[in-house]
Regions:
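General structural signal for secondary-structure boundaries
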Residues: 1-8, 31, 85-87, 100-104
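Short amphipathic alpha-helical surface micro-motifs
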Residues: 1-4, 44-46, 56-65, 101-107, ...
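A generic local structural motif
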Residues: 5-8, 28-30, 48-50, 108-110
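Short beta-strand segments
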Residues: 15-48, 53-55, 61-65, 74-77
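Short beta-alpha junction loops
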Residues: 67-69
Length: 170
């Protein structure tokens, strides 16, 4: 079987620390940290991990990758979604690598056991279908707006040292 992975898809996804997933029944894509390993992107969802509703049940999703240099959308590709079963050979190979990539884990050493019981490790395998790439972007406006969150702050900016003018000395 030939490898359907486009070199641009692999290189862009490997370099990017964040991908955007167009999940079923959601109005806009969700950001997700990931790991690229052996021709596929791996993400962890469920429990206290990143919320990606509908991903474990999905068969295919569209993945959008941004440019590491400019931050703009670089390539979008379609992925076949499959769950990595706990205890499988693939689990044993991928989960330690994912654990190293996971920042600020609340349980550190025991996170892999927690993932086995309450989270899903999902494999996103490129199908070979590239929906957007440089020179083939849609003409319409397609910027992703941030997901509403109670963690935003609105108010006056904090006091800045040296920000007020002083009276001249006499």
């Amino acid at each position: 079987m030939s490898d359907p992975t486009n070199p641009l898809v692999e290189e862009a996804t490997k370099r990017s620390g964040l991908i955007w997933l167009a999940l079923p029944d959601l109005p806009q894509p969700r950001a997700a940290w990931h790991l690229w390993h052996d021709g596929a992107a791996y993400v962890v969802t469920g429990g206290i991990e990143q919320p990606l509703p509908g991903l474990p049940e999905a068969e295919r999703v569209t993945v959008t990758v941004r440019s590491k240099d400019k931050g703009g959308r670089l390539v979008s590709w379609v992925a076949a979604v499959s769950e990595v079963e706990s205890g499988s050979e693939e689990w044993e190979a991928v989960v330690p690598l994912l654990a190293k990539e996971r920042l600020n884990a609340p349980d550190g050493e025991t996170q892999t056991e927690r993932w086995a019981h309450e989270a899903f490790v999902m494999r996103l395998t490129p199908t070979g279908e590239v929906t957007e790439s440089p020179g083939e972007m849609p003409a319409g406006y397609a910027a992703v707006r941030p997901v509403p969150s109670p963690a935003t702050s609105v108010g006056k900016p904090p006091f800045m040292v040296g920000g007020r003018r002083r009276r001249p000395d006499r």
